[in-house]
Amino acid sequence: MLTLLLIIPLVGALMLAPMQGNTRQSESQMKRLALGTSLINFVLSIVLWGEFDSSTSEYQFTQEFNQVNFCHLHIGVDGISLYFVLLTTFITPICILSNWDNIKEQLKYFLMCFLVLETLLIAVFVVLDILLFYVFFESVLIPLFLIVGIWGGSATRVRAAFLLFLYTLFGSLFMLLAFLVIYYNVGSTDFQVVSLSEINLESQKLLWLAVFISMAIKTPLLPFHVWLPRAHAEAPLAGSVILAGLILKLATYGYMRILIQFLPDATSYFSPLVQTIAVITLIYASLATLRQTDFKALVAYSSIGHMAVVVLGLFSNTIQGIDGALLLSIAHGVVSPALFILVGGVLYDRYHTRTIRYYRGMTAYMPLFSIMFFVFTIFNAAVPLSANWAGEFLCLAGAFQRNPVFAVLGSTGIVLSAAYSIWLYNRIAFGAWSKYLNYTTDLTRREFMLLLPLLFVAVVFGIFPNIILDSIHASTSGLIYSAS
């Protein structure tokens, strides 16, 4: 079944390759083919979820195809990777729908990039080999670079694409060196073999630092955060959705799968340092969010703050913290794309400006938009009965067990998150109608149907977070106990 999840998007991309998009009918056929392919993959992932046994921490649905001297194609999922696979197949059709009407140039290649990107992301989460993990982890940059550089929103899009590409590629060179050293010492790149091997603490420290630099850039943590706001500001809407919904989650997965599982002693040693960086990043990003004038940059900085809370929970080295980090990652992967669709899609498509000061009084003329914007804004602020709140609470509870100071400082992020969320909604929704804006229509049917599944998932996982927590508990517990 995992093989099908990897192959189906590639088949869809190959079917798109010979098609010509010279007419409106042919463009519609290409979009329907890409959307249908991604929906088939989503249904298949739901079947995978239904057949998954959450009572064990072992890898399931494993398949092994060939073996060579240095790596082999071995795939499988556990409770940790399963939800990242589900998130990938859920977000991809939303990406395709989000730019359904406003990509006119090279549409075929735009759709092919997203289908190839879906395969690469799923591969990152299911491969059980550190070298293949690195290959797919870095291969994601190629379609992402094309998406931002070709279909971005302004003349500086190429610069933003290069910034994204070079920043993340530079950090990953250290990770490659670390993986080669692990292979040299252990004699294998298989996850299970590496996790059972014993590496002395001094070697672990060097390997840990090399991998951490790569993950810190992808998260991103201070001071490696510069690329993300620029990439979000220049990316097309679908690019922003996949950046917030999926690309940032690669770091979350890498922290759990590589650092905590394979280098546990070094993780314990460096945890206070990482939590300090996470708290500084959280406070800095939240304060920077209050100063933004571009609403895509504002949502981007809020994402940095939320990912800092994820890191704070992960490096508490507690079951509660890691459970909360995974739950918050999934919640952020749903809520943040919805905010980008609302401000970077609905508003920008109508008025073609991202400057917040031009917007005011939207409640009177776009009531449905205002309701949706209010719901996702308060979810982003982690109000009770939202999945963000459950995730942040568990992250802070885990941090409190290790060091109450980090938990108290991290809690300031909740206050600042509420501050910028309330300010943004009040600025856009209320007040007299702006003289800079023409009257326009409310949410279209496509926009509403695009937001509805995101709203459904955010509400269900907010009211019933145990749907996720119960099924990941065995895997996260196994992660902690095997590390200890």
UniProtKB/Swiss-Prot annotation:
Keywords: Electron transport, Membrane, Mitochondrion, Mitochondrion inner membrane, NAD, Respiratory chain, Translocase, Transmembrane, Transmembrane helix, Transport, Ubiquinone. GO terms for cellular component: mitochondrial inner membrane; respiratory chain complex I. Its EC number is 7.1.1.2. GO terms for biological process: aerobic respiration; ATP synthesis coupled electron transport; electron transport coupled proton transport. It catalyses: a ubiquinone + NADH + 5 H(+)(in) = a ubiquinol + NAD(+) + 4 H(+)(out). The keyword Transmembrane helix applies. It is an enzyme of class 7 (translocase). Pfam families: Proton_antipo_M. It is found in: Mitochondrion inner membrane. InterPro entries: NADH_Q_OxRdtase_chainM/4 (IPR010227), NADH_UbQ_OxRdtase (IPR003918), ND/Mrp_TM (IPR001750). It is a multi-pass membrane protein. One of its GO terms (molecular function) is ubiquinone binding. Its main location: mitochondrion. The keyword ATP-binding does not apply. The chain crosses the membrane at residues 1-21, 33-53, 77-97, 109-129, 130-150, 162-182, 206-226, 236-256, 270-290, 295-315, 326-346, 365-385, 405-425, 448-468. It comes from the Eukaryota. Core subunit of the mitochondrial membrane respiratory chain NADH dehydrogenase (Complex I) that is believed to belong to the minimal assembly required for catalysis. Complex I functions in the transfer of electrons from NADH to the respiratory chain. The immediate electron acceptor for the enzyme is believed to be ubiquinone. Belongs to the complex I subunit 4 family. This is NADH-ubiquinone oxidoreductase chain 4. It comes from Mycosarcoma maydis (Corn smut fungus).
